[in-house]
Amino acid sequence: LGLVRPVGSEDEARTIIAACKKQYHDARHNCWCYLLRDGTERYSDDGEPQGTAGIPMLEVFRRAGVTNVVCVVTRYFGGVLLGTGGLLRAYTAAAADALADAGISEVRRWLACEVSTPYALYEPVRAAVAALGGVVQETQYAAAVTICALLPEEAGEVFAAQVRDLTAGRCAVRPVGETERAVPLAGAGL
Protein backbone atom coordinates (compact mmCIF):
# COMPACT_ATOMS: atom_id res chain seq x y z
CA LEU A 1 0.00 0.00 0.00
CA GLY A 2 1.42 3.39 -0.94
CA LEU A 3 0.27 6.78 0.29
CA VAL A 4 1.48 10.20 -0.87
CA ARG A 5 0.23 13.46 0.67
CA PRO A 6 1.30 17.10 0.42
CA VAL A 7 2.70 18.57 3.64
CA GLY A 8 3.96 21.95 4.76
CA SER A 9 5.99 20.96 7.82
CA GLU A 10 7.72 18.12 9.63
CA ASP A 11 4.93 18.06 12.20
CA GLU A 12 2.34 17.57 9.46
CA ALA A 13 4.42 14.77 7.89
CA ARG A 14 4.87 13.03 11.24
CA THR A 15 1.13 13.26 11.94
CA ILE A 16 0.35 11.51 8.64
CA ILE A 17 3.00 8.85 9.30
CA ALA A 18 1.58 8.21 12.79
CA ALA A 19 -1.95 7.92 11.39
CA CYS A 20 -0.78 5.35 8.80
CA LYS A 21 1.05 3.34 11.45
CA LYS A 22 -2.08 3.36 13.60
CA GLN A 23 -4.38 2.41 10.72
CA TYR A 24 -2.08 -0.38 9.52
CA HIS A 25 -0.77 -1.44 12.94
CA ASP A 26 -0.95 -5.10 11.91
CA ALA A 27 1.42 -4.59 8.95
CA ARG A 28 4.97 -5.88 9.10
CA HIS A 29 6.46 -2.55 7.95
CA ASN A 30 5.30 1.06 7.50
CA CYS A 31 8.31 2.62 5.76
CA TRP A 32 8.23 6.33 5.05
CA CYS A 33 10.03 9.37 3.75
CA TYR A 34 9.37 13.07 3.47
CA LEU A 35 11.00 16.02 1.74
CA LEU A 36 10.34 19.67 2.47
CA ARG A 37 11.04 22.76 0.39
CA ASP A 38 13.55 23.99 3.02
CA GLY A 39 15.78 20.96 2.28
CA THR A 40 14.66 18.78 5.20
CA GLU A 41 14.65 15.09 4.27
CA ARG A 42 13.84 12.20 6.59
CA TYR A 43 13.16 8.50 6.04
CA SER A 44 12.71 5.21 7.86
CA ASP A 45 13.22 1.61 6.80
CA ASP A 46 10.97 0.54 9.73
CA GLY A 47 12.77 -2.73 10.37
CA GLU A 48 13.59 -3.59 6.76
CA PRO A 49 17.31 -4.11 6.00
CA GLN A 50 19.10 -0.76 6.04
CA GLY A 51 18.87 1.15 2.76
CA THR A 52 16.18 -1.03 1.17
CA ALA A 53 13.08 1.12 1.76
CA GLY A 54 13.36 4.72 2.98
CA ILE A 55 16.24 5.86 0.78
CA PRO A 56 14.89 4.27 -2.44
CA MET A 57 11.52 5.91 -1.73
CA LEU A 58 13.23 9.25 -1.10
CA GLU A 59 15.07 8.92 -4.44
CA VAL A 60 11.75 8.62 -6.31
CA PHE A 61 10.76 12.08 -5.06
CA ARG A 62 14.21 13.60 -5.57
CA ARG A 63 14.25 12.43 -9.21
CA ALA A 64 10.76 13.84 -9.73
CA GLY A 65 11.85 17.18 -8.21
CA VAL A 66 9.02 16.99 -5.68
CA THR A 67 9.10 18.64 -2.26
CA ASN A 68 6.62 19.22 0.57
CA VAL A 69 5.49 15.62 0.36
CA VAL A 70 5.27 12.59 2.63
CA CYS A 71 5.11 8.99 1.44
CA VAL A 72 4.27 5.91 3.50
CA VAL A 73 4.53 2.42 2.03
CA THR A 74 2.89 -0.30 4.10
CA ARG A 75 4.01 -3.89 3.54
CA TYR A 76 2.44 -7.06 4.81
CA PHE A 77 4.59 -10.18 4.76
CA GLY A 78 3.29 -12.54 2.09
CA GLY A 79 5.43 -15.55 2.91
CA VAL A 80 8.13 -14.90 0.31
CA LEU A 81 11.46 -13.34 1.27
CA LEU A 82 12.30 -10.72 -1.36
CA GLY A 83 15.98 -10.17 -0.55
CA THR A 84 17.59 -6.73 -0.57
CA GLY A 85 17.26 -6.25 -4.34
CA GLY A 86 13.62 -7.30 -4.31
CA LEU A 87 12.83 -5.01 -1.38
CA LEU A 88 14.56 -2.09 -3.07
CA ARG A 89 12.56 -2.64 -6.27
CA ALA A 90 9.29 -3.16 -4.37
CA TYR A 91 9.59 0.03 -2.29
CA THR A 92 10.77 2.07 -5.28
CA ALA A 93 7.84 0.85 -7.39
CA ALA A 94 5.31 1.42 -4.59
CA ALA A 95 6.50 5.01 -4.04
CA ALA A 96 6.55 5.73 -7.79
CA ASP A 97 3.06 4.26 -8.27
CA ALA A 98 1.69 6.24 -5.31
CA LEU A 99 3.19 9.45 -6.69
CA ALA A 100 1.82 8.77 -10.18
CA ASP A 101 -1.64 8.10 -8.71
CA ALA A 102 -1.53 11.25 -6.56
CA GLY A 103 -0.21 13.47 -9.35
CA ILE A 104 2.19 16.37 -9.05
CA SER A 105 1.14 19.93 -8.37
CA GLU A 106 3.08 23.17 -8.31
CA VAL A 107 2.42 25.78 -5.62
CA ARG A 108 2.15 29.20 -7.23
CA ARG A 109 1.27 32.72 -6.19
CA TRP A 110 -2.13 33.86 -7.44
CA LEU A 111 -3.74 37.26 -7.73
CA ALA A 112 -7.32 37.37 -6.42
CA CYS A 113 -9.38 39.95 -8.26
CA GLU A 114 -12.90 41.08 -9.05
CA VAL A 115 -14.45 42.52 -12.20
CA SER A 116 -17.98 43.91 -12.38
CA THR A 117 -19.25 43.83 -15.94
CA PRO A 118 -22.54 44.16 -17.83
CA TYR A 119 -24.25 40.81 -18.53
CA ALA A 120 -23.42 41.09 -22.24
CA LEU A 121 -19.67 41.14 -21.47
CA TYR A 122 -19.67 38.38 -18.86
CA GLU A 123 -18.73 35.56 -21.25
CA PRO A 124 -15.78 37.38 -22.92
CA VAL A 125 -14.35 38.37 -19.50
CA ARG A 126 -14.82 34.82 -18.16
CA ALA A 127 -13.08 33.46 -21.27
CA ALA A 128 -10.17 35.88 -20.72
CA VAL A 129 -9.73 34.50 -17.18
CA ALA A 130 -9.58 30.94 -18.53
CA ALA A 131 -7.26 31.84 -21.43
CA LEU A 132 -4.70 33.21 -18.96
CA GLY A 133 -4.80 30.05 -16.83
CA GLY A 134 -7.07 31.59 -14.21
CA VAL A 135 -10.03 30.20 -12.34
CA VAL A 136 -13.41 31.83 -11.74
CA GLN A 137 -14.11 31.16 -8.07
CA GLU A 138 -17.45 32.88 -7.75
CA THR A 139 -19.91 34.75 -9.91
CA GLN A 140 -22.37 37.20 -8.35
CA TYR A 141 -25.43 38.22 -10.35
CA ALA A 142 -27.03 41.59 -9.56
CA ALA A 143 -27.43 44.76 -11.66
CA ALA A 144 -24.06 43.74 -13.12
CA VAL A 145 -22.17 40.45 -13.03
CA THR A 146 -19.23 40.37 -10.62
CA ILE A 147 -16.58 37.78 -11.41
CA CYS A 148 -14.29 36.77 -8.54
CA ALA A 149 -11.24 35.11 -10.06
CA LEU A 150 -7.77 33.81 -9.29
CA LEU A 151 -5.11 34.52 -11.90
CA PRO A 152 -1.47 33.49 -12.05
CA GLU A 153 0.43 36.39 -10.50
CA GLU A 154 2.28 37.14 -13.74
CA ALA A 155 -1.02 37.45 -15.68
CA GLY A 156 -2.52 40.28 -13.62
CA GLU A 157 -1.47 43.21 -15.82
CA VAL A 158 -2.31 41.37 -19.04
CA PHE A 159 -5.78 40.54 -17.69
CA ALA A 160 -6.38 44.16 -16.65
CA ALA A 161 -5.46 45.32 -20.17
CA GLN A 162 -7.70 42.68 -21.76
CA VAL A 163 -10.65 43.73 -19.60
CA ARG A 164 -10.11 47.37 -20.55
CA ASP A 165 -10.02 46.39 -24.24
CA LEU A 166 -13.00 44.01 -24.06
CA THR A 167 -15.18 46.54 -22.25
CA ALA A 168 -13.93 49.67 -24.07
CA GLY A 169 -12.69 51.01 -20.74
CA ARG A 170 -16.06 50.64 -18.95
CA CYS A 171 -14.80 48.00 -16.52
CA ALA A 172 -11.65 47.65 -14.45
CA VAL A 173 -10.02 44.82 -12.55
CA ARG A 174 -9.99 45.31 -8.79
CA PRO A 175 -7.21 43.36 -7.01
CA VAL A 176 -8.43 41.97 -3.68
CA GLY A 177 -5.36 40.06 -2.49
CA GLU A 178 -2.84 37.34 -3.19
CA THR A 179 -2.71 33.70 -2.22
CA GLU A 180 -0.70 30.53 -2.78
CA ARG A 181 -2.41 27.60 -4.40
CA ALA A 182 -1.38 24.20 -5.73
CA VAL A 183 -1.98 23.65 -9.43
CA PRO A 184 -1.77 20.19 -11.02
CA LEU A 185 1.00 20.01 -13.61
CA ALA A 186 -0.08 18.64 -16.97
CA GLY A 187 1.87 15.61 -18.11
CA ALA A 188 3.61 15.22 -14.76
CA GLY A 189 3.20 11.46 -14.69
CA LEU A 190 6.24 9.37 -13.95
Predicted regions and their residues:
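C-terminal regulatory domains involved in ligand/effector binding and gene-expression control
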Residues: 1-52, 174-190
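Conserved short beta-strand edge segments in small beta-sheet-based binding/regulatory domains
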Residues: 136-140, 167-184
